[in-house]
Amino acid sequence: HVCYGIDGVPILKDISLGVQKGCIVTIVGPNGCGKSTLLKIISRILRPQSGEVLLDGCDVRTANTRSLARRMAILPQRKNVAVDLTVEQLVQYGRYPHTGFGGKLTKRDIDKVDEAMHAAGIETLRNRAIGTLSGGESQMAWIAMCLAQAPEIILLDEPTTYLDICYQLEVLELVRHLNRAYAMTIVMVLHDINQAAQYSDIVYMMKDGEIYNTGAPKDIFLPESFTDVFRV
């Protein structure tokens, strides 16, 4: 039962949800409904005013940061990194929960980095600076970093926003591959309802800071829902 607000204005109102292991779970809803705020609370970026987020029965707020990072990766919508950092260096950051900052990469770490770049199809970009990549290439590199982290759960905040349609589909196909090939649990925020319908096992539809409905896409993407939630 998570609640969150700013300056007395409620943003999330008594939110309760559960995520089944091995599923792709997508949060949808109109702008300002609290989707990204909810994802930030799940990932511990924001602290709820009441309620708690549990991972296998343990409150994530009390978890050791490195231990939590070994289990859960987050890809925010806005990312800051030195533009001259190479793709390979960025993906190597995903190993820091295992090695510690400044820790030397072992052969296993290097193999994980190579595997992640291969899965994302960016091996040929390994020596390119992040600042020289297209938006789609950059997003694939960031997702590869999350994969190198070897978590059980990946949280993605609007991973297809501002990308050309071809890269949107590549990103979502990669997300599906991570779910199926690595049994990773995916929780993501999406704006595009068609993409949510195609790539999700379970959808949480939000309206005005609350969960409006949840279920398989075919069960909740109904005309009356679109009218009530999206006013279309």
Question: Can you say where each PLM-predicted feature lies in the sequence?
Answer:
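Helix-to-loop junction immediately C-terminal to a conserved catalytic motif
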Residues: 43
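Conserved ABC transporter NBD signature motif
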Residues: 51-59, 68
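Catalytic Walker B motif of ABC-type/P-loop ATPase nucleotide-binding domains
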Residues: 154-158
